[in-house]
Amino acid sequence: MNMPPTKEPYDGYCGTSYAAKLLGISVGTVQGLVEKNDLKAWKTQGGHRRISLQSIDAYQRRHNLAPASLMQGEDRLRVLVVEDDDETRLMLQANFDQWGLPLDAVMYASAMEALLDMPSLQPQVLLTDLRMPNVDGFEFLKTLSSHALFSNLAVVVITGMSAEDVQAKGGLPEGVQLLQKPIDMDWLHGFLDALMSMRQINRRSRAQIA
């Protein structure tokens, strides 16, 4: 399984989940816009829908919508969640909203869809399950760990598997955190908060050097 080459933000295409986040609408509504040709899209050989980012920008302009950019603002954390369980995704999003942290989260049920969108999204945090249909979390992380994006990515595996079972499957790449289900939301809150604090410290240090 190969990962798409890294692209500049908003250059090229994205999947339906990312398009929905950019437009502030549901995935179903995005699919409806594609069917009405309001958004330009095509499908990969694997059947995954790709949507032109240029057509999303054009749609926003036609309808006088403010561009909803996940790439704007260094103070916001970009979080990508890969989890095939609907209830877990909803629970994570509800907690993110409740915490009020400056983050933008994009949810995926498919590891393949997430891989296709990562060059456009350029997340700083990845939360991923391991047991998923088609491409599982082990294969997902193996593919991702060979890509340049991985070096600057904070990764947390969220799984119902025990540490022993994970190790028996080959283990995780170095630096990946293991968080077992049921999810300790206090730990996750603290982890994300700490990442944001470190980013602020690093930005101040760069500003002082400049």
Predicted regions and their residues:
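Short helix-start
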Residues: 9, 13-18, 36-65
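C-terminal output helix
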Residues: 55, 183-195
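A short, Lys/Arg-enriched interface patch at domain edges and termini
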Residues: 56-80
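Two-component/phosphorelay signaling modules centered on CheY-like receiver
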Residues: 86-106
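Helix N-cap/capping motif at the beta->alpha junctions
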Residues: 107-116, 137
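Receiver (REC) domain active-site loop signature in two-component systems and cognate sites
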Residues: 132
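Alpha4 helix (beta4-alpha4-beta5 surface) of REC/receiver domains from two-component response regulators
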Residues: 139, 162-179, 190
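Hydrophobic/aromatic residues positioned on beta-strands within the core alpha/beta folds
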Residues: 156-158
